[in-house]
Amino acid sequence: MTVYLHDVNRGLGVFLLVVSFLLPGCSSSGGRRASVPVMVDATAQVVEQARQTWLQEHPNWGFHGRAAISQGRDGGSVRVEWEQHGRGYRIVLSAPMSRQSWVLSGSSSGPARLEGVGGWVRVGEVAEQVLFEATGWQVPMGLLPDWVRGRNSGGGDVQLDAEGRPHRVYQRGWQLRFLDWFPSSVGRPVLPRQIEASRGSARIRLIVDQWDELIP
């Protein structure tokens, strides 16, 4: 990705941000077409930088939400309860229709543990692989902690919206779109409300119903 940042009008503090990346095409080759320039003014840049700083300074967080996950013609919906304490996580997934539930826990620097109904347990070094072997779902567990909060980890190609927030992200073969945001509140910046991710035939749509700030 090449990012060109030109000073369009120093007096007005307006900048032209051109993020050169390719969007998925309609062909099977997955070709991309160049994006259009996005105008991001100086005020929006300052606000977004403050938001990114806030995210870095608040590593303990959680949310309640819903997710629709599909792999080709197969898929399902789950309730999601996510708790993140620094690098450690505990995620409860429950599927009301099938009455199944799973608890995925671990750390980004250690093994992952998945517990299911009936007491069975799977343990592995990579959370994404552990979850896939048990459910058949492709979920980028290593990327989600940053994605769900709209945090720029610096590891992908990013297109910003007019507010300077991430709008589309391309990372490790995944395409992510931010569809809606919660407005800022006292002591908390804007946070994603709805995101959608896809890679090949895998699709994930996440809706956050409530954000929680966890006590260290």
From Swiss-Prot:
A lipid is attached at C26 (N-palmitoyl cysteine). Residues 1-25 form the signal peptide. A lipid is attached at C26 (S-diacylglycerol cysteine). It is found in: Cell outer membrane. GO terms for biological process: lipoprotein localization to outer membrane; protein transport. Keywords: Cell outer membrane, Chaperone, Lipoprotein, Membrane, Palmitate, Protein transport, Signal, Transport. Pfam families: LolB (PF03550). GO terms for cellular component: cell outer membrane. It is a lipid-anchor. CDD domains: LolB. Monomer. Belongs to the LolB family. NCBIfam families: lolB (TIGR00548). Plays a critical role in the incorporation of lipoproteins in the outer membrane after they are released by the LolA protein. This is Outer-membrane lipoprotein LolB.
